[in-house]
């Protein structure tokens, strides 16, 4: 019954707004106006005139022109106040019939919350000191035919915030700020890398063989070529081909697609930056990683100290570095530096309550120990390096202990934020790694790598020693905006169809 009542109320509200729309047409007013030239945004008016006293503003003769969405309206008789909202925030406007004329004031009185308006007038301060604009011209620029969510309660339904992001952006200053911050983060990242001599490139999003990561791909079909294609699960292998071709420092910021679960940390479509630098190794990439992230925080937030949930995180270099085996040994006492068989490693896992499959090798067990005991404890920025060979098919072997690789992952607030390594540039070894991955696929791991003959052929022409890095942009934005869910920092996250329910 309540839903039916709300439905009827909404129907009535929509009908009233349609009637107002028709009335505007009847009066010869275009409810969906054309180009409108502004002189200021709301924050620019406040910044330019806030330092003046009420009396000083009364003596000035400045004229400003603004446009935005009507968010509040009050008053009666021949004068009223309202707030309009634009990209800079909100500002109060004061509309008097004797200042704008009877026709324009009649338009003002008929306006609904949500309507787009343009105003011109003189900046002034009210008795309580609020920066405002005394309007002398007013036009409607876009009629809102649907009421906005209640201004005091906003969008309580989290799913509605994600489905109708435009409403979230209208009603939530915090959400607007988060997405503006996201844009600035990417701008600063680009500028940082450009200044270090990196070349931004674009590589295919549809691959004939999915590769560069352990993940399930989305599959599509090319009608003209009559072939199956895969949405990319990583950017890596094409960028390495460019290193082979002599482009020594390259990066790409782009979308990546993984046919996996949805959670507060995962969205099937997400944004990464991957970069590769010839003649560098993973130690160089560590320095680059902490440098770029600290620089972004300082430039965008003004500080390298950020708050994430209950944690205060310091991003100023240098960050902690720990070998994966040493971290496990310190926490559990288990020493994976010791030589042991796959079976002995699995036995240790069972002894310590770490779930493992009978097909898991030594390297997989080491990684399971790390994820089980260590990962979520790494709050401050920490480079964990020395990943097992079995889980790092594209990384160079460590020369001192070839069971491990010259690879690191960056963890902050218990989450992986970056993955990097000294790239494997030996085509013979790379083929063996892919063959080992094929065995894992046969054993049921559908995320294992496939054989990529074209990539191996590229390596056979010779690739210089190279350091590579991947950073998840969305998780970095989460960290720097104190956002609990990845869907809070992706404008239009993946959702179920409405008819499927939530």
Curated annotation (Swiss-Prot):
GO terms for cellular component: cytosol. Binds 3 Mg(2+) ions per subunit. It comes from the Bacteria. Homodimer. The keyword DNA repair does not apply. The lineage of its organism: Bacteria, Bacillati, Bacillota, Bacilli, Bacillales. Mg(2+) 1 binds at residues 409, 416. This is Lysine--tRNA ligase. Its EC number is 6.1.1.6. Mg(2+) 2 binds at residue 416. NCBIfam families: lysS_bact, PRK00484.1. Disulfide bonds: none annotated. Its cofactor is Mg(2+). It is found in: Cytoplasm. Its main location: cytoplasm.
């Amino acid at each position: 019954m309540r839903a039916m009542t709300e439905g009827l109320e909404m129907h009535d509200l929509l009908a009233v707004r349609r009637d107002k729309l028709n009335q505007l047409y009847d009066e010869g007013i275009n409810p969906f106006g054309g180009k409108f030239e502004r002189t200021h945004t709301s924050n620019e008016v406040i910044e330019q005139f806030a330092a003046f006293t009420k009396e000083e503003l009364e003596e000035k003769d400045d004229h400003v022109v603004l446009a935005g969405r009507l968010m509040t309206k009050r008053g009666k008789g021949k004068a009223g106040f309202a707030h309009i909202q634009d990209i800079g925030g909100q500002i109060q406007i004061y509309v008097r019939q004797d200042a704008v004329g009877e026709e324009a004031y009649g338009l003002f009185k008929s306006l609904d919350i949500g309507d787009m308006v343009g105003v011109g007038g003189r900046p002034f301060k009210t008795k309580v000191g609020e920066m405002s604009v005394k309007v002398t011209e007013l036009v409607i620029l876009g009629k809102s035919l649907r009421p906005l969510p209640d201004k005091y309660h906003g969008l309580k339904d989290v799913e509605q915030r994600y489905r109708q992001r435009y409403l979230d952006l209208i009603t939530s200053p915090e959400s607007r700020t988060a997405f503006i911050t996201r844009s600035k983060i990417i701008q600063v990242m680009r500028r940082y890398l450009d200044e270090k001599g990196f070349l931004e490139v674009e590589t295919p999003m549809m691959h004939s063989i999915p590769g560069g990561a352990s993940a399930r791909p989305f599959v599509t079909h090319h009608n003209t070529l009559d072939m199956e294609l895969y949405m990319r699960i990583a950017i890596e292998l094409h960028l390495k081909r460019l290193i082979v071709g002599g482009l020594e420092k390259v990066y790409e910021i782009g979308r990546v697609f993984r046919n996996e679960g949805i959670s507060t940390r995962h969205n099937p479509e997400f944004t990464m930056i991957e970069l590769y630098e010839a003649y560098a190794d993973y130690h160089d990439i560590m320095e680059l990683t902490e440098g770029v992230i600290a620089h972004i925080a300082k430039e965008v937030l003004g500080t390298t100290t950020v708050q994430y949930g209950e944690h205060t995180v310091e991003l100023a270099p240098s960050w902690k570095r720990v070998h994966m085996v040493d971290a496990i040994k310190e926490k559990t006492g288990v020493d994976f530096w010791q030589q042991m068989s796959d079976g002995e490693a699995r036995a240790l896992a069972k002894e310590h309550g770490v779930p493992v499959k009978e097909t898991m090798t030594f390297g997989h067990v080491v990684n399971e120990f790390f994820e089980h005991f260590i990962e979520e404890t790494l709050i401050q920025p920490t480079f964990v390096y020395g990943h097992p060979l079995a889980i790092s098919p594209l990384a160079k072997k460590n020369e001192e202990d070839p069971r491990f690789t010259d690879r690191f992952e960056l963890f902050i607030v218990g989450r992986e934020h970056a993955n990097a390594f000294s790239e494997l540039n030996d085509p013979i070894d790379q083929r063996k790694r892919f063959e080992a991955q094929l065995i894992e696929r046969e054993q049921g791991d559908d995320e294992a790598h496939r054989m990529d003959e074209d990539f191996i052929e590229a390596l056979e022409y010779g690739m210089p020693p190279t350091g590579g890095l991947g950073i998840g942009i969305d998780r970095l934005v989460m960290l720097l905006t104190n956002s609990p869910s990845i869907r809070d920092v992706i404008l239009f996250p993946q959702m179920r169809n409405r008819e499927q329910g939530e």
